[in-house]
């Protein structure tokens, strides 16, 4: 294999690679939308799937879509009996707030590319395709076919790839995914997304929480949390004091507004980050719960807030929940 020739091809294709990543990033493909008969995981992921197949065909690969859930671009002689897989995905988490650029445009600044999906996982998917293109143009003789397989539901459970595997599609003899860090990750955590529901009886206290909302995805640190409060006149001074004296943590900001109807809205801004590395974010929900506790809310609401803060709080390893795990090989 002539690596100098391959590197020269990659250098030649640099601008085309960047433009193609931007082309795919420009398709908003947030999961969780209502399914359609032709779009099992919503129209956004389906549109990104179609765009991926179009791009693959344009660059000379055998391409097809499986049940509008999985896209394939394949390199190598069809007579080769074995196949190596490259696994990626084209669905993304919501863009959220706080962007200084259009998350669906793919902006280049200081030689960096910014946009939702640039790193997870549209950029890596297209980079893998261009690596396959470089192998082909360099005349590398393959012993096995290389199949780039992209799913449309990775962020919400990988049901697309699960369907691909369980339906009897050809399976690879080996594979890897560029949805990770270089050079290698050889293990992956499990995850649970619980949903809890509990009624709160009115307690007649001078501060009551009417609503508390935060986050746009279960696998990301929430960057914004909003609480609407009913505050008795006797408690307004206490609310003002708590807001003024609250020592906002890193990357956090608290604001308070009173509506014409007399309700108060507390807004906590934080810093979103992928759920695999929550220590780098600032959890707006956890910080706002801490503020609400300082207001001395009583009854069942107060007990719930106390429990959430005690068990979860701003911890990122689940110590108080009893789920923290460490070993010498994989770390935390």
What kind of region is each of these model predictions?
Residues 1-5, 193-332:
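Metal-dependent amide/peptide-bond hydrolase catalytic core
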Residues 2-118, 137-142, 152, 184:
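Acidic/His- and Gly-rich active-site-bordering loop/insert found
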Residues 72-74, 175, 195, 228:
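Conserved hydrophobic/aromatic beta-strand scaffold that supports enzyme active sites
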Residues 77-79, 106, 140-142, 166-170, ...:
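Solvent-exposed alpha-helices and their adjacent loops that cap or buttress functional pockets
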Residues 94, 156-158, 183-185, 217, ...:
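Flexible loop/turn segments at secondary-structure boundaries
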Residues 113-126, 278-286:
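Short, conserved micro-motifs enriched in small and acidic residues
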Residues 121-201, 234, 240, 316-332:
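Acidic/histidine-rich catalytic neighborhood of metal-dependent amide-processing enzymes
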């Amino acid at each position: 294999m002539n690596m100098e020739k391959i590197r020269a091809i990659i250098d030649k294709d640099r601008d085309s690679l960047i433009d193609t990543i931007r082309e795919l990033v420009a398709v908003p493909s947030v999961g969780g939308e209502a399914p359609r008969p032709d779009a099992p995981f919503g129209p956004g992921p389906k549109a990104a799937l179609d765009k991926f197949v179009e791009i693959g065909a344009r660059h000379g690969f055998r391409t097809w879509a499986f049940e509008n859930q999985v896209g394939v671009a394949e390199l190598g002689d069809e007579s080769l009996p074995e196949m190596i897989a490259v696994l990626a995905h084209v669905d993304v988490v919501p863009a959220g707030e706080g962007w200084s650029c259009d998350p669906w445009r793919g902006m280049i600044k200081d030689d960096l590319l910014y946009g939702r999906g640039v790193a997870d996982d549209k950029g890596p998917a297209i980079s893998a395709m261009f690596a396959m293109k470089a192998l082909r143009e360099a005349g590398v003789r393959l012993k096995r076919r290389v199949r780039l397989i992209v799913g449309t539901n990775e962020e919400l459970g990988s049901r697309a790839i699960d369907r691909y595997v369980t339906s009897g599609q050809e399976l690879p003899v080996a594979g890897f995914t560029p949805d990770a860090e270089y050079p290698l990750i050889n293990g992956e955590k499990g995850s649970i997304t619980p949903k809890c529901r509990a009624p709160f009886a009115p307690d007649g206290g001078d501060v009551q929480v009417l609503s508390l909302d935060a986050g746009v995805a279960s696998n990301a640190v929430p960057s914004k949390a909003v609480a609407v409060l009913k505050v008795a006149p006797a408690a307004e001074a206490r609310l003002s004091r708590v807001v003024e004296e609250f020592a906002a943590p890193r990357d956090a900001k608290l604001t308070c507004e009173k509506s014409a109807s007399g309700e108060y809205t507390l807004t906590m801004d934080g810093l979103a980050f992928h759920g695999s590395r929550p220590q780098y974010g600032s959890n707006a929900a956890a910080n706002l719960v801490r503020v609400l506790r300082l207001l001395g809310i009583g009854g069942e609401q107060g007990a719930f807030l106390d429990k959430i803060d005690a068990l979860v709080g701003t911890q990122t390893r689940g110590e108080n929940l009893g789920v923290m795990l460490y070993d010498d090989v994989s770390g935390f």
